[in-house]
Amino acid sequence: MSIVQPTCDSWAATLSAFLTQTQVDRTDFVSPESGKPAGSLTVTEGFTSSGAKVRIVDTRLFIADLGLDAAMIHAFAPSQSTSPHLLSDLATMQDPTDDGQRRTTWHFHVDLMPRVDLVTAPEFIDAVYPPITQAYNDAYAIADMLPIAVPHRLRSLASPWLVGAIVLPTDNVATSQAFTAYAKHWHELVNSPPLVSDPVIQRARDIAHRGAMFNDETDP
């Protein structure tokens, strides 16, 4: 029985509730070894209240025999805008304990991916990140939480507000609260982009940034 998928169902529902005129395309995965269902890829496109067209990419993997239970839920703002993308994932892991045993943990990430160079546009920092600072701090204050060793290349492409936490499955309420805070603020920023930018230049930057982010060298 999955412990990740129900939590991520609620995350996906939170994002879908922001949209109207949705179009949904779903592809189911099947294990080549067993022939059993192994997950799915669901792409949902729709419009926010401001008329911005966005895309939610929801990837699920669940193979009980292998102990694989994971989800990635990303919400992409218009490519030509400066509104951040929401990136999140949740997966179970079997981590070693001090007594030589293993325990089931959750590896949790959430971030609002910056859409400009934060060094040259600190006003983007001021416009985007203060409202999620409390959620960031709360995530790292979860009892017995351990920080994930995020690869340096990946961290450099993310924001300083990237949450990477190892928690227990019983911390599902706390992780969902962090996700919801980031998701609601993402929706606000899609409706009101933080900065004005040339749409052609912005789209080219976004393509390059996403190409670097979703790359095996960045996150092997």
Model-derived features: positions:
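Extended, charge-biased low-complexity segments
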Residues: A52-A141
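Mixed-charge (acidic/basic) macromolecular-recognition segments
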Residues: T105-D219
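Short, flexible coil/linker segments at or flanking structured domains
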Residues: I3-P6, P96-G100, I201-Q202
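Residue-identity detector for threonine
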Residues: T7, T14, T20-T22, T27, ...
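Short Lys/Arg-enriched alpha/beta "domain-start" segment
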Residues: M1-H85
